[in-house]
Each structure stands twice: as structure tokens, then as C-alpha cells.
């Protein structure tokens, strides 16, 4: 890693060093190298996802947000960054910020997007709308979640539960 002390113009050598450290289970040593990769190449999704996995494992929601925020600019088509940033805000009980991130993520959805992730976006949005007492929007979000994945257990459970609590559309809740 002594070569990494020199200013790099290409992220390839740093990424190679990081991959070597990761294969040797030297995550702590790989972390600053992965940050160096992102300084050189902020669009490097594998490096950012690896750092993100470390932050998630440590349950460091501030770091998750810090890693995801620039990713939304550099790689706006990678839905995982919206997902984890939205979840981090949700865990920090920042409902408005979480909802904003998920809305931006939904705007990036294409025919090629992972339908499970898209369904989860909408399911979580349903939960967030419910927290904000915006039930019409919550039910619309749950409906959208089920369009993308009809057996999304989280969406089905919360949708049915909230309908039963409100005593509305009980036949729909039973479905």
C-alpha cells in the first residue's frame, strides 16, 4: 500500500489494493483505501457499496447517509443508494427526509429495475405516509408495492393492519 501514498490519478490501483485487503479479511485497512478510490472516482459504485456495507454492519446511519448522498448525484440510476439512504433517515425518525429520498428513487425506476426493490420502496413509502397520517397516499403506495410484487409480505401485513384499524375496506384487507 506504499504506492497508495502517492497521489493517484486513476482509481484502478487503489481499487486493486482494496480488493486484496478485502480478500484477506482486512476490512479496517481497506476502508481508507476505498475512500481514496471514491476521491479519485466518485462514480465507483463497487467501492461505495462496500463502504456502505461496512456502515450498515456498524449501524452507523450518519455514515450511510454521508455515503449515499453523493451517490445520488454521481450514479442516480443505482436504486440501492436511495433505498439505504431512505432507510437510514427512517431509522433516525426523519420521516420527511426519508420520504423525499424514496420519492426521488421511484423517479429513477425503469423497466429494468429490480421489482423487489421497487416494491419495497413503495411499501416503506406507505409506512412513512401512514406515520404522517396521510392514509390515502399510504394506501396508494401499498397498492403500488403490490403491483411490483404481489406477495410483498411487509406491504400486505401493514396494508391489511391499517385497513382493519380504520375498519375500512375489510373485504380488501382480507384479500
Functional labels for PLM-detected ranges:
Residues 1-175:
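Alpha-solenoid helical repeat scaffolds
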Amino acid at each position: 500500500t506504499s504506492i497508495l501514498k502517492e497521489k493517484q490519478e486513476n482509481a484502478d490501483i487503489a481499487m486493486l489494493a482494496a480488493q486484496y485487503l478485502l480478500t484477506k479479511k482486512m476490512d479496517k485497512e481497506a476502508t481508507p483505501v476505498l475512500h481514496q478510490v471514491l476521491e479519485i472516482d466518485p462514480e465507483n459504485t463497487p467501492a461505495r457499496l462496500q463502504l456502505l456495507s461496512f456502515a450498515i454492519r456498524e449501524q452507523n446511519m450518519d455514515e450511510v447517509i454521508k455515503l449515499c448522498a453523493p451517490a445520488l448525484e454521481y450514479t442516480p440510476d443505482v436504486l440501492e443508494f436511495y433505498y439505504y439512504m431512505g432507510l437510514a433517515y427512517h431509522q433516525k425518525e426523519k420521516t420527511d427526509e426519508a420520504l423525499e429520498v424514496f420519492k426521488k428513487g421511484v423517479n429513477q425506476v425503469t423497466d429494468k429495475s429490480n421489482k423487489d426493490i421497487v416494491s419495497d420502496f413503495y411499501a416503506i413509502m406507505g409506512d412513512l405516509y401512514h406515520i404522517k397520517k396521510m392514509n390515502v397516499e399510504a394506501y396508494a403506495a401499498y397498492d403500488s408495492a403490490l403491483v411490483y410484487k404481489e406477495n410483498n409480505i411487509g406491504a400486505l401485513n401493514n396494508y391489511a393492519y391499517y385497513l382493519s384499524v380504520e375498519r375500512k375496506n375489510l373485504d380488501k384487507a382480507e384479500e
